[in-house]
């Protein structure tokens, strides 16, 4: 499971294999769908565009979340939240939660409360008022605060910090010395002091990962190399899309972790590239060689991962005046490759090691139709 609606969260854990929770989901009437990233991405863009049309500034934080700057807006902010929620629901059919507060961290808590108490809040909570803010802080466990993970929760609870209110009242400098500046900023934000600015332009990623489960267990090296080549090509597309190059990559493969009767194996290889690059051909060749080094026969492999690291803008690697750089011909080739795939669809042109319809691809028997992204799957109205 890679995503859950709020109502489904009590019945399934993030990352839990579907076969382990299938019966429980059916028992509670929870419907599961296979991943359809094209549809989700398109619907996300529609939701974000609608929100951006109603606020002065907006930061798209993830595929299903954004922050909006309401500075300068006069009138009832709660009503504005209701209007945003109603417009998104009317135009996309997607219900959203709206949290309004003076800092990002408080807005996350308000949003969480809006969804947790949906029948009372209508999906909108404004905690700009100190009394409402304090009520939410007192009734929120510290583990539910944005950026506080399980390990951090254990340390904080050992210090007597069990609620968001406890964290807001904790000494910021002590938190900084004991943990990090991140925890200090979180506490200050909970107390109402803004520490996190709105980022209207998303900063370039520091690493790019492409990882997938195989549709079936693989035992031979050849199909595993095909899968790694496929994931490398996708990661390289993302790399070029943000205008970056990489100097290192890590390739890893592993067996299933939820079958106690099977032998387990997991290994990865770190690859130093000859020069900073975003060339799919060079990256695929390096990834294929790495897989050959870490593959061991006799195991049933279930997943592969490609991680691109040391990301920079072209020209930022200046440690050696005479260092090799990516040939101009490679830049031109990748530009043409992206233009063709952008015009005719992803995968129209690809490396020869990437199959068109692999039998190891992800199983998507329960995938919803691509109603908004494919002309042959439009919703039919009779």
Model-derived regions, located:
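Residues that scaffold, gate, or flank divalent-cation-dependent active/transport sites
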Residues: 1-63, 67, 73
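Short secondary-structure capping/junction motifs at helix and strand boundaries
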Residues: 30-33, 56-61, 77-81, 89-98
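Short Gly/Ser/Thr- and Asp/Glu-enriched loop/turn motifs at secondary-structure junctions
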Residues: 61-65, 101-104, 244-248, 299-303
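Catalytic palm subdomain of template-directed nucleic-acid polymerases
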Residues: 68-85, 114, 160
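Long, highly charged, low-complexity intrinsically disordered interaction regions
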Residues: 80-143, 305
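DNA-contacting surface of Y-family translesion DNA polymerases
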Residues: 144, 152-298
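Acidic, metal-coordinating catalytic segment for phosphate/diphosphate chemistry
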Residues: 273-382
